[in-house]
Amino acid sequence: AMMVALVLPGFMWLRAGGRSSLVAIGAAPAFTFGLITILSVAYPVLDIEWEPSTALPILGMSALGGAGAWSLSFFRRSNDGFSLRGVPLREAIGVRKPIGGRQAAIRAATWGAILVGFVLAALPLVMGAAPSNPIQQWDPTFHQNGVHAMLYGKNASPFGGLHELYGGRNVYYPTGWHAFVSLFARYDSVIQASNVSSLALMAVWVVGLAALVSVLTASRSAIMAAPIIGGMLLNMPADALTMYNQWPNS
């Protein structure tokens, strides 16, 4: 569910802009977190509580809007404009031509490399601890308490959403991660939701690396090597998402 919410809203809009599937999936989480940040700032002003029933429908509507824009964009590119020119709608919309065997093999190899990178990144976390175990470090404890504060206070704004952690003072603190995780956590499942978010961020990391390299070079070997190497790096994801779990920085 986290990955769907992270990817789907931005993916649709990026595909409407003509980006490849890989780039759209890699960049989509930034779109989603940007939208969440805007909502988290606007909701207190509008006196709207931050909870799944108020935030997730907006993400869903964004995805639907993007899907509509993508459909119109594809229709326009396929028909040299929006005119049907006497062609039936079903025929005008058409079906994309199947990709060839070579292209299919390249895509399969690329996504296979991404899967390998994700497994390498996630293995220490999955093998080393149960999902219900809290990370025994000061930073993840702070952030998990931040999610708890949002569940109780219904305020995810970076301008005071974590006030309970600062003696009631409304200080600025980037709350994108806390706001997102609070949409999938209950009062008794903050630890589990936080740990699952680590896996989601690992997936975002390896896909994002492959997407970044794909726009920097046409080398297939470099594109496939990027997520595998990225999955084994010590600073990220090993340190940031397994050892110290500095989620907002990740």
Sequence positions of predicted segments:
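Membrane-embedded, hydrophobic transmembrane alpha-helices
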Residues: 1-106
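Core alpha-helical transmembrane segments of integral membrane proteins
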Residues: 23, 27, 110-112, 208
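Internal/C-terminal transmembrane anchor helices
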Residues: 100-125
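Active-site lumenal/periplasmic loops and adjacent helix-entry segments of GT-C-fold
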Residues: 116-250
